[in-house]
Amino acid sequence: MAESSTVERYRFRKMIERLENLRGQGTELITIYIPPENRLSDVIAQMREEYSQASNIKSKRTRKNVQSAIEVVMQRLKMVGETPENGLVVLVGTVQDGTKEKMVAELIEPPEPVDRFIYRCDSKFYLEPLKEYLEEKDVYGILVMDRREATIGLVKGKRIEPVKRLTSDVPGKHKAGGQSQRRFDRLIEHAAHEFYQKVGEAAREAFEDVKDLKGIIVGGPGPTKEEFLDGDYLPKDLKEKVLTVVDVGNTDESGLREALNKAEEALKEAELVREKRLVRKFMEEAVNGELAAYGEEVDELLKMGAVEVLLVSEDLEGYKVILRCPECGYENIVTVKEKDEAKKYVEECPECGEAELNVEEIKDIVDYYVELAEQMGSNVEIISTETEEGAQFYNAFRGLGALLRFRPK
């Protein structure tokens, strides 16, 4: 089963946090961002030049480490062969590991295309472009309008794609009075009605086939946007996706950006609302129903395939230690806060008594639960602690819970 977006983001964030803590003694950590259109053979050729130039580094130690890192880069790129679809991020260098040094080599295929070639040599890895991938990349629609024009666009992350611009034939104000004024007012309203219909149709064409459209922002100066939404111009399913209505001064492409800036809080809240609903559903079921579980019970229910959705707090920390008897195969899985606590559980096998249990594996606790859930066909949601519900879930349920498909008897 494919990982949920919350799990992907969690793992990506954890990887970046780990890489952020790595340091070299000198400027000897190499970072390379390779766009998909760049050939790896060209990058290897550039690395040969960098290797030659590195011979000018005065510090013997730094020179040795930089050249060693460049050699590793060239070896790894030769093994990859062709540039992946989204490009490649290469992080190589000698880092401090307590009192020792070790060579680190990470090749990362990013979730989105690398947009420019970057080569850096520093005392830390250059991770800013990677951090940008952690920003929300959900797709939203934007419509800004008044009676003169309307502009429609799509938001993907922080990138705005203008889709369509429409201009109207709605006349301006008229100074005639009496019968002429009333007749002219009717013409204006009729023209506005026709323009709203065109805008509604254009919005339908722009938004209805967008996969996973999270919501729509509507903006503009004055009351036109409200008149449009109050009428039957936007299809019902799209009208239900309108997250917020904002006042903006422009209705051209600059108005799209203005509307997005004003709607940022609403967009953030939309994702948090989804999370809040999920946690509330779990809490209600935990108190009043049978289809929720938490604590040690979750492990067994996961293995039985009874879990529909596994909820894991992003603040959950610790490790799962898998111990096994080399003689009879008896297995014991325990939870520890620190890795070095594992040795406390190395004891005589309680099943056969013929040998000591071996520490077979130590896994990050979140990775353990995510992998187990995926093996059993359960969905996984990583719950933030930014909301009151998320914080309560972590504190009251220790950051681990499950919504069940069924309750075993």
From Swiss-Prot:
Pfam families: eRF1_1, eRF1_2, eRF1_3
Originating species: Methanopyrus kandleri (strain AV19 / DSM 6324 / JCM 9639 / NBRC 100938)
Complex and partners: Heterodimer of two subunits, one of which binds GTP.
Job of this protein: Directs the termination of nascent peptide synthesis (translation) in response to the termination codons UAA, UAG and UGA.
Compartments where located: Cytoplasm
Molecular functions per Gene Ontology: translation release factor activity, codon specific
Gene: prf1
Entry GO terms, CC: cytoplasm
UniProt protein name: Peptide chain release factor subunit 1
Keywords, alphabetical: Cytoplasm, Protein biosynthesis
Similarity remark: Belongs to the eukaryotic release factor 1 family.
InterPro entries: eFR1_2_sf, eRF1_1_Pelota, eRF1_1_sf, eRF1_2, eRF1_3, Peptide_chain-rel_aRF1, Peptide_chain-rel_eRF1/aRF1, Ribosomal_eL30-like_sf
